[in-house]
Amino acid sequence: MACKSVLFVTLGFLLSFCSTAKVNKHFFPQNFKIGVANAAAQIEGAWNEDGKGETIWDRFAMSRPERIFDHSSPQVAADSYHKWREDVEMVKEMGVDHYRLSIAWARIYPDGYKTEEPNAKGVAYYKNLLRSLRALGIEPMVTLYHWDLPQKLQDDFGGWLSPKIVDIFADYARTCFELFGDEVKWWITINEPKQICEAGYGTGVFAPGIVSPGVGNYKCAKNVLLAHAKAYHIYDKEFRKKNQGKVAIVIDSNWSEPASAKPEDQEASERALQFTYGLYGNPVFNGDWPAVVKERVAQRSKQAGLKESRLPALTKEEIKLIKGTHDFLCINHYTSHMVSAWYEAPVTDTSLTADIGVNDWMPKEWPRGGEGWFSVWAPGMRKLLNWLKNTYNNPEIVITENGLSDNTGTLEDDHRINYYRDYLSNCLDAIYIDNVNLTGYTAWSILDDWEWSTGYHSLIGMYKVDFNDLTGLGFLGSLLHTSPKSPRTAAWQKILENVYIKQK
């Protein structure tokens, strides 16, 4: 019987950060799926070609370049719209089971609104991509919305702040199910609503840049969940019988490690998790907002003299609509923080951070990734998987993103080998020791991309992209004899050779 093993060779070179953790040497179950991922806005480029409409990230990056670390934009990115065949070859070389990608809403409906006919060239692009993957035995996992809202919808009614978005998204979802349903068995409705809502409509650090802390983010959360639920029910009623696919929403979360065994620190950890994953996961899996979220926001709203909670209530009908809209549970996880109890912020501070009310930090001894928020602590993966198991009644879990950011651009990314080794080992601990129903793992990212507000500064790909030489003919590429897309020495190849072994 074929199995997949997590056996690692001893590396004969100095690692950028060293791990002393014991590596789990069990086998992944035979049906365990391993894949890689990326998203349309981050790699496709061709921002206004072949009928594609403007997105909120196009507008945000090009009209406010100071909001992007390197003042760049996604106009070209990794040029995958033109070089998709190369991307398919890269996925093939990796030998993975699935490739997670997203559809650019504005490439199907340029203004976001359903029209009599979708954009033919956009449809052809995705059909060619999906069929090529399937022909190679690679299962597409397709995300309908990965942050790139058509700008027209933001201009017309405020995007995710308005209930109008719910039915418009549902129309778009139905079109995608109709067009691509024969090629896709794994559908993701929406990716990381916490980032969409908190960063986009709370702090405003992401597109569309709306600053409305403690108000806009919660309005957005409700509309995102309703849009997801409507899309799920459309698939369930109209397409599931024919296409036999699965549908889920992707939610991201750090692990919040309690600073001590004190009850107040344990409570702080649980509260942080409920405000991050639970805010979106609880309505989908258990119905309604988490109790602690409702209680704290209502209390702080009342103390501030507001007549109603800043967190909009879900009606009985809405709870019924949202609850149960999952065929599996998705988690994007990169990093962990330490948390402890904290003082109560003034009620005039309406931010999500104030509503959570915990102190969080990264211990100095934890290694860092390429960004300031990124700490490396692999046990957080196992702990988070167990929390999801216990909180949501042991669902099937698929890790839909996990990876290490880097800002050196090196091809000798030994630190990434260590990261994947330790995080995958903790996944195996969760499966074999803790009986977590983990069935899939997806590494982010297949190649370097345009990483939103950090632009091209944060490099996280299995393939290095020379963003200055996407033609492959530039001086640097000629001098180094490299393609503009070059495999990093070892992270994924070492994983394939020594982790993803099929033992006969």
Label each PLM-derived region with a short phrase.
Residues 2-3, 140:
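N-terminal onset of structured domains
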Residues 3-20:
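Cleavable N-terminal signal peptides of Sec/SRP-targeted secreted and luminal proteins
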Residues 20-68, 93, 111-113, 120-504:
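Active-site region of glycoside hydrolase catalytic domains
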Residues 31-33, 81, 88, 98:
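A common structural microfeature
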Residues 69-83, 161-163:
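Active-site mouth loops of central-metabolism enzymes
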Residues 76-92, 110, 118, 122:
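Internal amphipathic alpha-helical repeat/solenoid segments
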Residues 97-104, 139-143:
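Short, well-structured secondary-structure segments
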